[in-house]
Regions:
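Peripheral, non-AAA+ core regions of ATP-driven protein-machinery
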Residues: 1-170
Length: 170
């Protein structure tokens, strides 16, 4: 298990992209799983749990998966990243930007390829809505970033507890 792994298990049955996996510690429905096939790591999602067996739907070709293939459970649910650049990009079901995947691998989507969904290098204009002295709580808007006619609201994360006092705007 690596440092990002919450729990682990191994494949006991495979039916196409549906795997039955015996696991060793608590997991939850909807949790992200990584199926390790040689050097590749295939993404899947826990869709059902019965006792110590989880059914995992793998989102790509499961060639090479066999009895005892290791599976790592990541401790978080499948999620999509939101932000500027989302509206101007075409994605696959795992939120891989297809144009960048094609640049990296050619016209055929290779399994085990996961690219960041949003461009981390592009600079975006930020318009603050909060002012110095404002006290914000989770879910409150700090400001926005325009993308075309759409405004991406930048908010205090819902994972933040307590209040934030704005001291200055950069």
């Amino acid at each position: 298990m690596d440092k990002n792994t919450h729990s682990s298990g191994s494949v006991v049955q495979a039916f196409g992209n549906l795997l039955h996996v015996k696991f060793d510690s608590p997991i939850r429905q909807g949790e992200v799983a990584r199926v390790i096939v040689g050097e590749e790591s295939l993404l899947g999602e826990v869709i059902e749990i019965a006792g110590d067996i989880a059914k995992i739907q793998v989102f790509e070709d499961t060639r090479g998966v066999k009895f005892n293939t290791p599976v790592h459970f990541m401790g978080h649910l499948l999620e999509a990243e939101l932000g500027p650049g989302l509206l101007s990009t075409i994605f696959d079901g795992l939120q891989n930007p297809l144009e960048k995947v094609a640049d990296a691998t050619g016209v055929y989507l290779e399994r085990g390829i996961y690219l960041p969904p949003l461009d981390r290098e592009k600079k975006w204009d930020f318009t603050p809505l909060a002012k110095p002295g404002d006290v914000l709580k989770r879910g409150d808007s700090i400001g926005f970033v325009p993308e075309g006619r759409f405004r991406h609201m930048i908010m205090v994360p819902f994972s933040h507890f307590g209040k934030i006092t704005i001291t200055s705007i950069a």
